[in-house]
């Protein structure tokens, strides 16, 4: 399990940075935190909770787009959210009436139809991420929280940097140890012990994403006003 956790650690960090503006992870009895300095006014609640069919979802998204454009000169063109939030879109009165004009909002709304409408109306391409992972405590967590809607520009938002672990630098030359690099930057070290006789296994990784575009991202908590 430890190796699986290490293999997804960099992905967890990237999604934390994108959806919260910071990283907070636990490991080896320590808490690792890093704040990317995202402007506080680029993290906001909504005018009315989006679960309310009368919420002004389109206006909220336009407000966020205008804010990022005004502050940075960059247009946000992508968004990531959950199926829960897409369900709010599906029930939203304004969105339904805008799509089903001839039937006064009556009709079935698929995710594909909603995505196309938002793309045509606001030039925002929506991605749904409902993927989950098991954290260090064994609890199942989401990469993207249920009630989060994150807007960001096209292109590369940053990159992940990998460092050399102590096992790679110090133990690879020792006959008593066997170090293998798996996935990206994950060092799996096995060492034979004589007293008592056993094999000790360590799984280590050193990595940190950078996020130079943090000020070009807008995060909505859609369940709070």
Short names for language-model regions:
Residues 10, 14, 69, 73-76, ...:
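Residue-level signal for secondary-structure boundary elements
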Residues 11-28:
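Short, glycine/acidic-rich hinge or "gate" loops at secondary-structure transitions
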Residues 3, 76, 198:
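Extracellular structured ligand-interaction cores
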Residues 96, 101-225:
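Sequence/fold signature of self-assembling virion shell proteins
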Residues 31-113, 117:
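Extended, solvent-exposed, turn-rich assembly/linker loops in the middle of proteins
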Residues 8-9, 208:
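Generic hydrophobic alpha-helical segments
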Residues 8, 31-35, 125:
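Ser/Thr- (and often Asn-) enriched beta-sheet segments in non-cytosolic proteins
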Residues 1-8:
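Short, small-residue-biased leader/transition segments that mark boundaries at the very start
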């Amino acid at each position: 399990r430890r190796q699986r956790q290490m293999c997804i650690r960099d992905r967890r960090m990237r999604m934390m940075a994108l959806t919260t503006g910071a990283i907070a992870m636990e490991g080896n009895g320590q808490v690792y935190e890093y704040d990317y300095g995202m402007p506080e006014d680029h993290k906001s609640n909504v005018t009315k909770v989006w679960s309310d069919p009368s919420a002004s979802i389109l206006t909220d998204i336009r407000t966020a787009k205008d804010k990022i454009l005004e502050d940075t000169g960059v247009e946000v063109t992508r968004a990531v959210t959950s199926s829960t939030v897409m369900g709010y879109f599906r029930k939203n009165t304004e969105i339904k009436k805008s799509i089903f004009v001839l039937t006064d909002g009556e009709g079935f709304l698929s995710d594909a139809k909603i995505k196309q409408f938002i793309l045509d109306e606001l030039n925002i391409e929506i991605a749904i991420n409902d993927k989950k992972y098991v954290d260090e405590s064994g609890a199942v967590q989401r990469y993207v929280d249920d009630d989060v809607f994150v807007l960001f520009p096209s292109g590369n938002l940053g990159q992940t940097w990998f460092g050399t672990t102590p096992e790679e630098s110090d133990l690879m030359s020792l006959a008593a140890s066997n170090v293998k690099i798996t996935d990206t930057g994950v060092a799996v070290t096995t060492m034979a012990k004589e007293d008592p006789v056993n094999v000790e296994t360590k799984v280590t990784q050193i990595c940190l994403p950078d996020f130079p575009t943090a000020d070009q991202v807008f995060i909505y908590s859609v369940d709070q006003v």
